[in-house]
Amino acid sequence: MVMVDALNLGRRLRVRSTAYVAGEPVPFFWPMRTFIHHNPLYGLEHMPFEQAVRRGAELFHARMFLPRSDYQRWQREGKVRQDTLAEEIARRAQALPAVPGIDWPRWLQALMQSAHDRDVVVPGVRAPDVHAALHGQPPSAQAVDVAVLLPALEQRLHGLTLPEAVDALWGTRLADELDELVIKSYLDFFDEDQSSWRMPGRERGLFAAWSEIARRNARMFLRGLHVRRTLGRVQDPESAVVHVMEEMGIDPDAWSAYFTRELTRLHGWTGFVRWRSSAKHYYWAQRYPAEVVDLLAVRLVVGLALLQESARHRRTPVRREQLDALLHERGAECLLRNALHSGEVLPDWAQRIDDTLSRGGSKRCEALLQRYWPLWQARQGQDQAAALRELAAAADATAALEVLSPEDIAGLIQGLQEFARQEGMVWTLAMEAQAIDQLLAQVQVPQDLAAGKRPFAQAWFCIDVRAEPIRRHLERVGDYQTFGIAGFFGVPVGFLGYGKGSESHFCPAVVTPKNLVLELPAELDPEEDDLLSTLGHVLHDLKSSVLSPYVTVEAVGMLFGLDLFGKTLAPLGYSRWRNRIDADKPVTRLLVDKLTREQADSIIRTLQRAMIVKALHAELHIERERVDDDMIRELRETALRHREGPTRLQRTFGVSDKQEAEFIDKLREVYRVDADYASYQLVRLGRIGYSLDEQVNYVHTALTMIGLTKTFSRFVLIVGHSGQTENNPYESALDCGACGGASGLVNARVLAQMANKTAVRERLRGMGIDIPDDTWFLPALHNTTTDAIELSDLVLLPPRHLVYLDRLRNGLRAASRLAAAERMPKLLPQARAIEPAQAWRLAHRLAVDWAQVRPEWGLSKNVYGIIGRRSLSERADLQGRPFLMSYDWRCDPKGRLLENLLAAAVVVGQWINLEHFFSTVDNARLGSGSKAYHNVAGRFGVMTGSLSDLRTGLPAQTVMREGQPYHEPMRMIALIEAPLDFAGRALQSVVKVKSLVLGGWIRAIVIDPTQGYKPFVFNNGQWEERPPLVAPAEEEHAA
């Protein structure tokens, strides 16, 4: 067997870079436990939106807009702006070919009101055949010219991979078989301890580990897939890619496009590998590396083996030039094959074509094609003529249609075909126009608080759309002022929870926190030795087991049995019972401050002493009670090279010089009692907590960002959020996206603790922000599934605030019940007239029902992003549709805060918005289908059934109801309250957002307070002026 020449470094890098670029249209896919919303067309955001959706449809074989009937339903409900529909039709009609007697706007209006969802243009139809059918004439009797028909088929086949091309002509399933085979290998390699079997050699990388298994894979060998032959000739994924592409005869200039086609067939797996290879801190990626070129190499090697097997059994092509030769030498046969296997063959001809192909022979195929093709073209013409007659009747243009020449009909078909690619965009623009009108009709001129007026409480919520209803109800049940801010509250937190063995990140997925916060029992005093000992154990490298060794398998089984019956028969009562049983976690506090050098040194000494005691027991079988502190101190000093000579270990226990020396060496090398490792531990300890400067900066930024720099309430609630659901792989999608798909409570606790510090407030006072002594920042958690708000860290609440606690809780509970009463009818249409208390109980039951596939709607129906003061929209009922970002341009003279909001919150909001958009328009390809068929894959994703692509989008239950779209797919409408020039500069400064606005990925509105609160809507590349906002009624303002 001849080994392929090793690739030089330059060629290897070229292959890797080509594979990397080919995968760029596929967006990252994060593991499900930290579900991150993403735009499925993120890799195409450099294109204008309308152009990108066309390209996305090609790449992902997906639909980009909904069927016509869904938009018509919304039109009947008043959700489509009629004049925008007419304007867009008229504008686009101007670009269509002029056809005598055809009034394009009337025809297109009729098309958009058609009762059918099917395409109006029949693929491949010929205008003369349509003309003949319209006039009841037979098609012209011309001989079929294979040379004329072949270019279209050749172009189509060249856009496919070779396995797909073979499938198109022979009706095989090579491409599907390839997907199934590689998915099995991907599952084995990427498994994160879900499977009981471990693929050996994974630390060497995907291609290397897979190669070793594939060489000995009996299933592949019995199938006749000789991957061993190919693998014996290559050394690495790059050489495998080169070898296979050369074996298939693919022109090097076409490699990138071919790679993209391969990688987008399983875009979920590709997106996961793209993210994984870039995640420097992801444990599984560091331990078992894999890159896009590995993924591609595995696909190509297996694909070549499938082609070779098919060639042996069916004499199908393996090389591109063989396919081209087949097309030119046996063109009639190829046309018949494509007709038979495309699903468009005339029903009564399928058997005859199949028989002829089985018998073979160019003359037979040519003769059959001459008989079949005119009949097929006639049927095409008849179908197209029927569709045009129906459309002409709806446009009141039947007479105009009947007098068209074949050339005119060709122009008509061309125009209809071009508009068919634009129709979904026209509907979307008209829906967005209506949504913009509805928004501008509800927002009002914002008003500041009356001088000297102090709200009872102020509450910060995440910008998440699910916070809008509860904020609205909270403001209406009492004297509450609310604000919106990204749910990590601007503080990236690395967190080590009480009893946890690993660090979690509570911040946006693209951020890596520098600081680590520890959660400790509240009774520990920061100055006590117990705290230092606890920290020593926290920083120790050894991992503790998940289950105590004293918990028996039988006990676990019994508990699961109780779960099974309890969650099924009485979910709400059982959940309360389990919570009482599990309530063993003590009251905790967070270590937010930096350690002093003395504390850090003391922690390291504590840890070293513990390691010495452990080593004495493990290496010399000496128990702790037999040694005193002086002996441990002496051993520690010796291991750190602070002293030399024998220790008391020799005199007390009769240890020889050699044994003592070996023991000291083990202390240094195995138990890490040495100076270098102590320095490393100091660095690790340096991550704990935040310096005073950092704390002041985080609190100051948060306060100025939301415009809260004066008139502080007695209570300032910092409300994180999370969802609650049982038996749901998408659980993290209901949590806070700004916290990396986790709960926002930790960040709320951290910022509250910072803001309550006297030293921080003193610094802020010097910066012009005077927080009264009686103001207390109180963390809380908003459960978006139940609408409950639970206060946290109440043990730290000053005694003088306790008298107001009942009033605070009563207000929160009332708002929560009203929010539940608003939300339950949307979730369960049968609960239309429901009392708040009943809705509250129902929401809690759904949250703990493990059979519930939709415990809440999540962020469905999101459409607005409002950046401005809350009083701009607080009188509006926006029905849980806006991301509400508090911002006061008067506190931002340089525009830096607005730029930060645009670069972070608006971009993330656009990701969320477009994930809902595309998951709705094609839930099978860009969403994830029904949850009912989902299975967890490797603990990092979900698949449909036992074998499929990784499902990357949102499940049907999140965006659909009873088979119809619940979410209304529109691009995010971002409204900014700021002077037009000021907002324009910020938009220009944030390059990404500038590109998104100019490219039509975001719809932008600016409300200019310096021009009488006039709205300016960005449309078709320019700002369009709208009438000024109205001021609130005097009685409302007084209230």
UniProtKB/Swiss-Prot annotation:
Q: Which organism is it from?
A: Nitrobacter hamburgensis (strain DSM 10229 / NCIMB 13809 / X14)
Q: Name one Pfam family in it.
A: DabA
What is annotated about its quaternary structure and interactions?
Forms a complex with DabB.
Quote the cellular component terms of the Gene Ontology held in the record: plasma membrane
Q: Which cell locations does it reside in?
A: Cell inner membrane
Q: InterPro entries recorded for this chain?
A: DabA (IPR018752)
Please list the residues that bind Zn(2+). Answer: 462, 464, 721, 736
Names of required cofactors: Zn(2+)
Q: Report the sequence similarity comment from the record.
A: Belongs to the inorganic carbon transporter (TC 9.A.2) DabA family.
Membrane topology type, per the record?
A: Peripheral membrane protein
Protein name, per record: Probable inorganic carbon transporter subunit DabA 1
Is Cell cycle a UniProt keyword of this protein? no
Q: Which UniProt keywords apply?
A: Cell inner membrane, Cell membrane, Membrane, Metal-binding, Plasmid, Transport, Zinc
What would you give as a GO molecular function for this chain, any one? zinc ion binding
Q: What does this protein do?
A: Part of an energy-coupled inorganic carbon pump.
